[in-house]
């Protein structure tokens, strides 16, 4: 038996009951994207029941080839780390620390001391905008561009020709250690290398995330302890700080992630968990408020879905979900606090089963643990009994 789980990063399906506390009322990544572009052409996701969850222009409601529902986020927050941790069974009591006014001066001073480089920026900003704003000064002085966002992130941007990527990575490791020493609960430190000339800088694919170690036992730990290999595709390794990952496969685009997932399905014929994150929706289109790019990326995934189905075996399960929203049609360029779809199919899965509104993303992880027959996670309610005949 194998479980293949694909997280469509930021593909939310409507506001959470508490969205207004996050300034996200009215957000609905899928519905609003479809409306903005006229319609979405997602015939295969429609077959999995996506159109039964909301009125998505172009995606009809129809009897599903498996099970479908939505999941609510129990943890406070709306970032990838919080979302993925909850998918794996960790519900945060307190949100990660945010820095709407930049990082404290004493932290930055110590960071400068340990890296031997000055810091410029130190404020919330769009990554593409801040390199345009401070890129020249960075080139002239070698200072590191440090910035944050509405998420719990400490980001360091540097031009590859000014600060070699290996040094940038070392600076990120210093930042990770420092934040932990200072007692700040920051989800991720992110290396943001770029290249090119002012004002047309471009970020290179050598981004690297340094995640906070998951604060509790979670799905991947339990699987690996039970000798079930976990194959992480995309940024899965980074989001769990490498915990519970047997092998990791980096990707440079959604299509690369899809192809690597299909290759694993074809090659790894033993019992295993294949866990993929496709980040382009979020990184390339959601944050940049580009509904047309977002729609195209969804359609590209949909087009490749039959290839995944074709390579699944009798006792395989496919789960498709998301980790938060990032509505490209709202004025905000940040993530949105949204519900997420949960779609499941496989030969053993009952047809056209409505899973309802699940109280937590952790139901996803608990169900997968239940299917593998490993010990229960600390959070979540399994819906295995709804899936199987």
Curated annotation (Swiss-Prot):
Residues annotated as binding Mn(2+) 2: 282, 287, 335
What Pfam families does the record tag this protein with?
Metalloenzyme (PF01676)
Q: Which domain of life is it from?
A: Bacteria
Picking any one GO molecular function of the record gives: magnesium ion binding
InterPro entries membership: Alkaline_phosphatase_core_sf, DeoB, Metalloenzyme, Phosphopentomutase_DeoB_cap_sf
| Protein's UniProt keywords contain Isomerase | yes
* Class of enzymatic activity (EC top level): isomerase
Q: Where are the transmembrane segments?
A: none
Keywords tagged on the record: Cytoplasm, Isomerase, Manganese, Metal-binding
Reaction(s) this enzyme catalyzes, per UniProt: 2-deoxy-alpha-D-ribose 1-phosphate = 2-deoxy-D-ribose 5-phosphate; alpha-D-ribose 1-phosphate = D-ribose 5-phosphate
Q: Which GO terms describe its cellular component?
A: cytosol
Q: Which cofactor does it need?
A: Mn(2+)
Q: Where in the cell is it found?
A: Cytoplasm
User: RNA-binding among the record's keywords?
Assistant: no
Gene Ontology terms: biological process: 2-deoxyribose 1-phosphate catabolic process; 5-phosphoribose 1-diphosphate biosynthetic process; metabolic compound salvage; nucleotide metabolic process
Per the record, the similarity remark reads: Belongs to the phosphopentomutase family.
Instruction: Sum up the protein's function in the record's words.
Output: Isomerase that catalyzes the conversion of deoxy-ribose 1-phosphate (dRib-1-P) and ribose 1-phosphate (Rib-1-P) to deoxy-ribose 5-phosphate (dRib-5-P) and ribose 5-phosphate (Rib-5-P), respectively.
What name does this protein carry?
Answer: Phosphopentomutase
